[in-house]
Amino acid sequence: MQKKKPYGKTLKEQLKAGARDRLHKFMLADGAVRGVIMNGTRMVNEMRANHELGILETLVLGRAYLGAGLMSAGLKSNDRIAIQFDCSGPIKGLVVEANAFGEVRGYLKNVPIQIDKPLDNFDLSPFFGAGFLSVTKHLEDAKHPFTGKVMLKYGNVAQDLANYYLTSEQIPSAFT
């Protein structure tokens, strides 16, 4: 795939734009609360340009890219994490993978996403339908990958990732 650079023609312009995408980790209350803040505007815009996605497709896959980026904050060395949504709605599903270096890649299973009428809000649950979320961790020192699987409860990438953490890893979480 030929990667498109939506930010500037020169290397200097591209590097300057890339400097704005950041991942910040922090701890509060003597380590009782961990947090990650991410700015991934450039990453999502490059994803949109590379996959030639429309607004709805960018919204869906972009949220998954950001979720994978946030989840990659807990990885080390050559570890990878894969997020897979399999669902019955028009999206059909998506796959996103991230590594410990913050590199994210992914794709939608159904492009373009068919809509019956113009959207009047950002509720994407009708496009997901029923289905499952699988999170697979490929840890460098492990012989086999670890996979956790939960039913889609909300039809929302952020809420379903938080539900995965609560259900599968017993870690109360929030993605916003």
Named regions from a protein language model:
Residues 2-176:
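General detector of N-terminal leader/presequence modules that precede the first folded domain
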